[in-house]
Regions:
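Short amphipathic helix-loop junctions that connect adjacent transmembrane helices
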Residues: 42-57
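C-terminal transmembrane helical hairpin of 12-TM major facilitator-type secondary transporters
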Residues: 87-134
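Transmembrane alpha-helical segments of major facilitator superfamily
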Residues: 61-70, 157
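A late C-terminal transmembrane helix in Major Facilitator Superfamily
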Residues: 125-128, 135-167
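Small-residue hotspots at the loop-to-helix junctions and early N-terminal turns
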Residues: 53-64, 151
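Pair of pore-lining "gating" transmembrane helices in MFS-fold secondary transporters
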Residues: 18-39, 121-125
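Helix-to-loop junctions at the C-terminal end of transmembrane segments
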Residues: 72-87
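Juxtamembrane intracellular "pre-TM" segments in multi-pass secondary transporters
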Residues: 1-27
Length: 167
């Protein structure tokens, strides 16, 4: 928040952000994606090392492959946004994440390391299309209140991640 905004103006700014349907859609999309990342960070060692008996020596390769895919898709995103509307790229990222989540769910009933690994790579990798685009699209509506909007994004990300992680 810049300048000396009064409490009333601050409340108005928060209300403006929280009631903006399009912006909240972007905020929720980045928040649910953020939750998926938290769950991956929290559960991946159990899934790979305990469930699939991946050694402690090999686990960093499995974990790092997911991060590498996210980096690759972030770099691809940087090129794509020069010519393609960020909302279309975001949509593609969300679709990729949902498809990957469905495969994870389906494969979990008859899990093998290969199907889970490939599904996880695309699930985590999709964040490269989601994070930057959803943030930019949400903040686009709040040029004067970008600090407030950014704080709403941060709080929403952690609240949703906390609730989903707890479940």
């Amino acid at each position: 928040i810049t300048g000396n905004k009064t409490k009333t103006k601050i409340k108005e700014a928060y209300k403006k952000v929280l009631t903006h349907k399009k912006a909240m859609g972007y905020i929720l999309s980045v928040s649910f994606a953020f939750s998926g990342m938290f769950i991956f960070i929290e559960k991946s060692s159990f899934i790979y090392m305990e469930y699939f008996n991946v050694s402690a020596k090999l686990f960093p390769l499995f974990f790092g492959s997911n991060v590498l895919m996210m980096i690759i898709l972030t770099k691809v995103n940087m090129k794509l946004v020069q010519n393609i509307n960020p909302s279309k790229i975001l949509y593609s990222g969300v679709v990729l994440q949902v498809i990957s989540a469905v495969f994870l769910l389906l494969f979990s009933f008859n899990a093998n390391i290969y199907t889970i690994f490939i599904s996880m790579i695309f699930y985590v990798g999709s964040l490269g299309f989601i994070f930057g685009n959803a943030m930019a699209l949400a903040l686009e509506y709040f040029k004067e209140d970008s600090g407030v909007a950014n704080s709403v994004i941060g709080v929403t990300e952690f609240k949703i991640a906390g609730v989903i992680g707890f479940l």
